[in-house]
Amino acid sequence: MQVSDFHFDLPDELIARYPQSERTASRLLQLNGNTGAVKDGSFKDVLELVQAGDLLVFNNTRVIPARMFGRKESGGKLEVLVERMLDEKRFLAHVRSSKSPKPGTLVFLGEEDQYSAEMVARQDALFELHLKADKTILEVLEEIGHMPLPPYIDRPDEDADKERYQTVYNQKPGAVAAPTAGLHFDNQLLEQIKAKGAEFAYVTLHVGAGTFQPVKVDNILEHHMHSEYAEVPQEVVDAINATKARGGRVIAVGTTSVRSLESAAQESLKNGTELMPFFGDTEIFIFPGYQYQLVDCLITNFHLPESTLIMLVSAFAGYDHTMNAYQHAVSNQYRFFSYGDAMFIEKKTQ
């Protein structure tokens, strides 16, 4: 398949630049992967769609304020977007400046040069930096960092984003983009779902900025997927096995939960074992033709045209059903992307 097969026209005004006043106030488009039928509703309908015995799998990563502004030794301005923390002092980052800083030079971080970091080496599009401070990278980011809103939101971050570009159940710092399907859940809705007899499990996938990188090849088979760190602990494996045994459904909240679970499934298939915990980097690329191993339903936002995520959804619901649902969403003025509306998708099984 070609990348252009996943194109759709999206009017600029349908890109959500701010969240709704309440988390659960978004709209929800239901899609049946077998029939292609769509149904319009509101996100609170999730309470009716989830059944007793189902398992919802959330990504509990926490978005870090990963964007810093500063300058080079020469005085030129730069912007640093942390992609991954290697340890408490070393990190990989995207660096934007008129000229790339050279290895061995210092960069000054913060509006008043509060901190400095040494440029250690370049790794493809990323730079390795070493913080020269008696604080950890996380502590420095909490002090001078900005929330790393996606490029299409196209505005400076605001104080409200510190809360709203974050799930209510976040636990483990490390993401530089939010697992956005989870943004629609508030504590009240979570309690109501639990009261129905559904169970919850938590994976961790630290979403990288690579999630916004465009696919630069025409043939999707030639695309090299970015790497992200994921954790699927033993308790998630146990919860999935118990859910399958009782006839419940595994409902992934977000594409990052899907990629975590399916990474664990693929690793176990490769090793010829039953489902095992997974801790490590994943470059899993899911596109039409992929056979899902674990996930039965998917809650997800609307994704960018020609992105790897619309390909993942197409593999889940069927290509034609997915593209038709997206056309329906555009025609009915759903809000798109991170702060936009959501879908509830039942997997295509026939």
UniProtKB/Swiss-Prot annotation:
Which reactions does this protein catalyse?
7-aminomethyl-7-carbaguanosine(34) in tRNA + S-adenosyl-L-methionine = epoxyqueuosine(34) in tRNA + adenine + L-methionine + 2 H(+)
* SUPFAM superfamilies linked: QueA-like (SSF111337)
Query: What pathway does the annotation place this protein in?
Result: tRNA modification; tRNA-queuosine biosynthesis
The EC number(s) given in the record are 2.4.99.17
Classification via InterPro entries: QueA (IPR003699), QueA_dom1 (IPR042118), QueA_dom2 (IPR042119), QueA_sf (IPR036100)
Q: Where is the major localization of this protein?
A: cytoplasm
Q: A GO CC term?
A: cytoplasm
Recorded GO MF terms: S-adenosylmethionine:tRNA ribosyltransferase-isomerase activity
Give me any GO biological process, just one: tRNA wobble guanine modification
Q: Output the superkingdom of the source species.
A: Bacteria
Q: Where does this protein reside within or beyond the cell?
A: Cytoplasm
Keywords from UniProt, A to Z, are: Cytoplasm, Queuosine biosynthesis, S-adenosyl-L-methionine, Transferase
Checking HAMAP family in the record gives: QueA
Subunit composition and interactions: Monomer.
Q: Which family does it belong to?
A: Belongs to the QueA family.
Q: What does this protein do?
A: Transfers and isomerizes the ribose moiety from AdoMet to the 7-aminomethyl group of 7-deazaguanine (preQ1-tRNA) to give epoxyqueuosine (oQ-tRNA).
Q: What is this protein called?
A: S-adenosylmethionine:tRNA ribosyltransferase-isomerase
What organism does the record attribute this protein to?
Vibrio vulnificus (strain CMCP6)
Gene behind this chain?
queA
